[in-house]
């Protein structure tokens, strides 16, 4: 029987000023580029290359994914939501710096948030939010509520390794030169992450038809469409 390190939840919000600064300045280009590339190559998303579409990024953090998409798909209406006020300030500052503040809207929202428009978005995204949530069903149910019929869905997050030693190795491999606060956050996030089997069970329990697969040595991805 395969042994897996026990999950250790971490705080739902990562919004302390030192955490926000370290996270905003960190180099997540590789994983964010992977996320964007995977989305733009989804068959159900290819139809929107030159068509207007409404997209929401749940747990958008400092906004890098929203901004990358805004550059590549100028016809899209892009909204990022997050429950961290300081994180949203960082996202808004990044948008202004790139002269994208009129292209991307950032909004404070704590899921589940009934003020967000229901069945409104053609694309629903989330990257690295699930492991922060005490109840993972909050994300999967929010996706069902916010996405229009046939909406494309993509969720990516860390996968919990089998041991603390493996978590330490991943921190050294990918955050060796990062500030200590970011190293600790990464280690804590790996321990708080869900396994592939756990995510697949969550998706089934939510009644979603998403394909869940491992996509790197530390990430899984879930993709599909809403059929409600």
Which residue stretches match the model-derived regions?
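C-terminal alpha-helical "lid/dimerization" subdomain adjacent to the S-adenosyl-L-methionine
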Residues: 156-207, 211-214, 221
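Conserved class I S-adenosyl-L-methionine
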Residues: 51-61
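A conserved beta-strand element that flanks and buttresses the S-adenosyl-L-methionine
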Residues: 125
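A short, conserved alpha-helix within the catalytic core of class I
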Residues: 133-143
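Short glycine-dipeptide loop
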Residues: 147-152
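Conserved alpha-helix/loop element of class I SAM-dependent methyltransferases that forms part
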Residues: 29-51
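Class I SAM-dependent methyltransferase SAM/SAH-binding core
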Residues: 56, 64-113
